[in-house]
């Protein structure tokens, strides 16, 4: 029996971009940046396998997709920002306070020897349960040629800290976790633009097993779908499904890890079983990026991000974070939060202001600044590129409804606990000049 829930056309018709309870705050054009030498976007906090943000020896730690600026004068920032995915790597930051004002850039997380493909895309950084300092970076190994390749993968290392900061060792190799199989989700043979990325790995409290949710597409040839009554939902009388709806085929996939594999640190392909998607958006949208779960008050909240530009069939919705809730465990059924699925969208006057929202177990939401309108008399369409973290906001979760409740500092994070480890400072390794060149 299928456990897949649907985000329907009727659900999406309920989206209200003018609702202040589901709208991100406006971003000032004079926003601060974290570091002028790098540009960052998708970001996540160091967490445990249960989804809680944790500190390590008193330090807050986050990872970010990043590129080094080529021109520090910002003369070419538009081109550099718009092509950033072609140079993306995973970097990290550390802070004593987590208040957003004192993030220190730590540099590259994975060694280049770990790269199975040229680009490192989004995922999750997770402390290994029952270890002192082992940490797994689940991420997307991506290449555009000779065909679109996007494979959830993992690299493992160790975290260290002293009075002055945080550093990592290891992360020298990567292991592929699973690939789009054309059965549970579309692969490159079915859809040359297929999405298969952003692994979020966690332990389900209900059965104690380790799962990964990820972005995918409904299996089948691109554009060759029939949008039937199940995909339409309870549409109003006379409503006609718009042209191109069959090109919206997003799915939130799920895979389960074999028992005992997590404890052994074995995340190889043979240890994962891909299951039917948790949610599909056939006829609605073609992207459900960075899916992640929150277990709260006996419910399972499933969040994802999407773009205005990936809606299909004439449907309209903002760039932002969307969500679904289940009262009956991880496998649902799920219903869209706020009836429509929209949790937080950009203000209509700043439609591209923020993106890649991530919701933590206490409802704090981090995102990055994308494009902020900054019109001048000479150029009314001028804008400022962000490439830094947006103000953190908080949402209240009340059953199947959400409400924007608080706005915090730029780049602020909140830990739900401290990783259980000897607080004594670690001894820094002595790195020779030749070793540093190899690492770089």
Where are these regions (language model features)?
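Carbohydrate-active catalytic/glycan-binding domains of CAZyme proteins
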Residues: 1-440
């Amino acid at each position: 029996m299928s456990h897949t829930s649907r985000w329907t056309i009727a659900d999406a018709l309920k989206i209200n971009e003018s609702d202040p309870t589901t709208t991100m705050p406006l971003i000032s054009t004079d926003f601060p940046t974290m570091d002028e030498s790098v540009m960052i976007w998708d970001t996540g906090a160091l967490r445990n396998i249960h989804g809680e943000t944790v500190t390590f020896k008193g330090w807050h730690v986050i990872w970010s997709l990043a590129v080094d600026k080529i021109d520090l004068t910002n003369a070419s920032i538009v081109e550099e920002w718009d092509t950033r995915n072609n140079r993306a790597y995973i970097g990290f930051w550390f802070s004593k306070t987590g208040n957003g004002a004192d993030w220190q850039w730590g540099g590259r997380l994975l060694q280049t020897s770990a790269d199975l493909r040229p680009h490192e895309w989004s995922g999750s950084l997770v402390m290994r349960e029952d270890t002192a300092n082992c940490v797994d970076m689940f991420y997307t190994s991506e290449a555009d040629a000779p065909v679109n390749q996007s494979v959830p993968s993992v690299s493992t290392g160790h975290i260290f800290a002293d009075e002055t900061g945080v550093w990592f060792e290891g992360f020298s190799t990567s292991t592929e976790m699973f690939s789009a199989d054309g059965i549970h989700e579309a692969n490159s043979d079915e859809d040359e633009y297929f999405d298969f990325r952003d692994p979020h790995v966690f332990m389900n409290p209900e059965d104690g097993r380790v799962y990964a949710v990820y972005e995918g597409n409904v299996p089948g040839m691109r554009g060759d779908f029939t949008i039937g009554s199940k995909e339409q939902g309870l549409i109003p009388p006379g409503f006609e499904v718009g042209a191109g709806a069959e090109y919206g085929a997003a799915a939130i996939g799920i895979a389960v890890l074999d028992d005992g594999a997590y404890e052994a640190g074995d995340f190889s392909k043979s240890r994962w079983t891909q299951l039917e998607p948790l949610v599909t958006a056939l006829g609605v949208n073609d992207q459900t990026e960075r899916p992640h779960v929150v277990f709260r008050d006996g419910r399972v909240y499933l969040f994802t991000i999407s773009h205005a530009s990936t809606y299909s069939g004439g449907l309209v919705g903002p760039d932002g974070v969307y969500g679904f809730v289940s009262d009956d465990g991880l496998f649902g059924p799920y219903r869209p939060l706020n009836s429509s699925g929209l949790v937080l969208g950009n203000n209509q006057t700043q439609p591209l202001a923020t993106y890649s929202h991530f919701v933590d177990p206490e409802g704090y939401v981090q995102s990055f600044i994308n494009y902020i309108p900054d019109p001048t008399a000479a150029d009314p369409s001028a804008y400022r590129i962000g490439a830094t973290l947006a103000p953190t906001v908080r949402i209240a979760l009340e059953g199947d409804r959400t409400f924007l409740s608080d706005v915090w500092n730029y780049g602020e994070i909140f830990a739900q606990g401290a990783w259980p480890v000897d607080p004594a400072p670690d001894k820094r390794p002595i790195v020779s000049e030749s070793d540093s060149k190899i690492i770089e």
